[in-house]
Amino acid sequence: MFTDWKEHTSHVKKSFGELGKQYPKMLQAYQALGAAAAEGNVLDAKTRELIALAVAVTTRCESCISAHAEEAVKAGASEAEVAAALATAIALNAGAAYTYSLRALEAYSVQKA
């Protein structure tokens, strides 16, 4: 497993800041996108972070996992809620693999014909 998630999260935030110094408009746009997604308060912070954590798993983004795990804790998510969100991500990834397997079989059949 990863050595130190808190250290990793700190490193990610520092790295974002460093890149943001070189490309401030890009960082501002990225931050604005996050703010726009939260606009309207339809989803509370905890729900948004549970979704973000599940998406981070499906996109295999370790930095996203680190940052959104921290935010999920801050938003008051329980371990059971995090586990349920992750179980949903696992099920969705399995579904994607299943449907892409059907496409692979179709491609094989077409290539064989």
UniProtKB/Swiss-Prot annotation:
GO MF term list: oxidoreductase activity; peroxiredoxin activity
Gene3D superfamilies cross-referenced by the UniProt entry: AhpD-like
Top-level taxon: Bacteria
Pfam families (alphabetical): CMD
Name of the protein in its database record: Uncharacterized protein HI_1053
